[in-house]
Amino acid sequence: MKKLSILIFVFVLSPLMAFAQAGHEYSPLVEKTVNYKNWSLTSLTTDKADDLRSLVAGKKLVMIVYFAPWCGNWRNEAPIAAKLYEKYKAQGFQVIGVSEYATRDDVKKYFGDAGAPFPVVTESETRDDKQKTLHYGYRQLTGDTRNWGSPWNIFLEPSKLNASSDVLTEKAWVVNGELIEDEVDKFIASKVTATSAVITPCKN
């Protein structure tokens, strides 16, 4: 009986262990109810307000990634996000970063003299703001139980967004952790290219 209990325990934990590899927090792409709202947040480069509707206009697919620049898991994902953006931006794919829990100066230092490879805006600047952010609220809705939730990724299809409502979309594809590159690459391709094989990520 003891051996059976151990086997069951290992079986239950094995999927979690597979996603938490060597300090990574990989998470699958899933469709969730999120009630994602339009926003107007300050651009890291211009110090002016950027409206989300304007940023996504004319795009086929947009990945919004919420991140804290000091977070190791974000630093794991950052080159993947930049790579996917470079690969598909000519086909209508856009990445937008939303910085959290760090000052704008710290975010600028993180990206260095070259700057961010895609548009970045700021939602919060201190760790004390964690539970006050929309980022935190969305994470609760999508079942993200991590402490800081960095990175947290949501995919929007501009052609399907509500044209006038404050809520842009009730449901969206999200990743509650680091991107699984192959999975997300295929998903992006299925949305921005006509000839790519369509992948159907798991729904729950």
Residue ranges and their predicted role:
Residues 36-62:
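A short beta-strand-turn-helix
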Residues 86-133:
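Conserved segment of the thioredoxin-like fold in thiol-based oxidoreductases
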Residues 66-70, 96-97, 173-174:
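Second-shell loop/turn segments in exported
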Residues 114-116, 125-187:
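Thiol/disulfide oxidoreductase modules built on the thioredoxin-like
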Residues 57, 76, 83-90, 112-115, ...:
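Sec-exported extracytoplasmic/periplasmic mature domains
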Residues 66-83:
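Conserved redox-active cysteine motifs that mediate thiol-disulfide chemistry
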Residues 63-64, 95, 153:
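Hydrophobic beta-strand anchors of alpha/beta hydrolase catalytic cores
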Residues 1-43, 189, 197-204:
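N-terminal targeting signals for export/organelle localization
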